[in-house]
Amino acid sequence: ANLILNAGHDASTLAHSDELSVNSLLTQHLAQIVKEYDPWGTRPVTAGCNEPDPKNHLFKSGAIDVIGFNYHHQWVKDVPKNFPGKPFIFSESVSALQTRGFYMMPSDSIYKAPKEWWLPYCDPSFKCSAYDNMHASWSSTHEETWDVVKHHDFVGGQFIWTGFDYIGEPTPYAYPARSSYFGIIDLAGLPKDSYY
């Protein structure tokens, strides 16, 4: 069952004035359309926002019932101040990188791959550490984000990117890599360490 309706995802529209913009009005319109498909008329609307600033057009629209951030776990502590009284979820989180059965040492070091999202990342092994110590430049490890959830009671939950590896968006490697390394379950349907 759908518990929350989504009016937008991967949205990163930052406002530079106090006026409602076309993007804010569009968010209001999309939220209205989404609510029309709710047979009970009770489900709240969220959006997966890449920009967690309260000046984001989606938040400024007033149409978002549940604040949703994609990543940005370091901003969560500011949610009660920036969005008083609003429920909060991680609409997309983690994006840790792992290959089942491959471990990079030292295990207590964190590896960002690539260092910045626009830079290439090269390692001839085409593998990522399964110690939950490797993540994309915009994200965090499972443990790091889970720690934020555990220590902030107002966090209603998180949607981890992703449950399964998938063909496409090869991250952190480029060709000849053909799939993501994000999943807690690999392409063969076998759990990685972070699954447990």
Map each language-model feature to its residues:
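Glycine-rich phosphate/diphosphate-binding loops that line cofactor/substrate pockets in enzymes
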Residues: 1-2
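Substrate-binding clefts and catalytic carboxylate motifs of secreted carbohydrate-active enzymes
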Residues: 6, 13-47, 59-61, 78-196
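Short acidic loop-to-helix transition motifs that present clustered carboxylates
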Residues: 47-54, 72-75
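Short active-site oxyanion
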Residues: 62-67
